[in-house]
Amino acid sequence: MSYEKVLQAGKIVIGTKQTIRALKEGKAAEVIVAEDADLPIIEKVMAAANEANVPITKVDSMKKLGKACKIQVGAAAVAILR
C-alpha cells in the first residue's frame, strides 16, 4: 500500500538527508522508511518526523521503496511533500 502512495505522490524527496531537510523545513506531509535500513539511519529520520509531527509509515524493503521511487538502488527513507 505505501509503495503505491509513493508511486502516486506528486512530489517526493528520496534519501535520509533530503527527507530530514524536508521535515525541518516543514515541507513533508508523510515519511516512509524501510525497515531493513540501518537502525541508526532510521532512528534519525523517525526522530525528525516525530519532532515535526509528521506521520511515519514503515515498509519492509529498501529495494522495493527505491523501485517505487523509480531509482535503480534502494531507498532508506522517502518524504511525500505537501
From Swiss-Prot:
Belongs to the eukaryotic ribosomal protein eL8 family. The keyword RNA-binding applies. SUPFAM superfamilies: L30e-like. This is RNA-binding protein GTNG_0100. The keyword RNA-binding applies. It comes from Geobacillus thermodenitrificans (strain NG80-2). Keywords: RNA-binding. GO terms for molecular function: RNA binding. InterPro entries: Ribosomal_eL30-like_sf, Ribosomal_eL8/eL30/eS12/Gad45, RNA_bf_YbxF-like.
